[in-house]
A protein has these predicted regions:
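A boundary/linker detector
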Residues: 1-12, 16-17, 21, 117-127
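Rieske [2Fe-2S] iron-sulfur-binding domain
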Residues: 26-127
Length: 127
């Protein structure tokens, strides 16, 4: 994929001033809800807002924390804990494995732009 194609796929979703530390925000990109998190170190993470266990769009309302050195988000529904870097569920609360799609965050000054998860790129290029 060319740099030009990536530029066309990336979308500005907000400014860092629109985010609060350790408080989630939801953004709608096309028909997909994305949860954004600003961490105390200034990093921004973006994952699917869809809780794979409950089927509800609630991840942005979860509790930010850490497990070891991994920044995490705990679902407000059944309390599963996900790694914000990889989307992996670290604490399944007795359920089967699941994960959140992870969006690539690109900062351009104060603006936050998102690139879709790798598995979504072929679909977006075809549209």
């Amino acid at each position: 994929m060319s740099i030009m194609a990536v530029e066309k796929i990336g979308v500005r979703v907000c400014s860092t001033r629109d985010l609060e530390v350790e408080r989630g925000r939801a953004a709608l990109i096309g028909g997909t809800q994305v949860a954004l998190f600003l961490l105390p170190d200034g990093s921004v993470h973006a994952v699917s807002n869809l809780d794979p266990y409950s089927g509800a769009h609630v991840i942005s309302r979860g509790m930010v924390g850490t497990k070891g050195d991994a920044p995490t988000i705990a679902s407000p529904m059944y309390k599963q804990v996900f790694d914000l870097r990889t989307g992996e569920c670290l604490e399944t609360q007795g359920k089967g494995p699941a994960e959140l799609a992870v969006w690539c965050v690109v900062r351009r000054g104060d603006d936050i732009h998102l690139l879709p998860p790798v598995e979504s790129v072929p679909e977006l290029l075809a549209s």
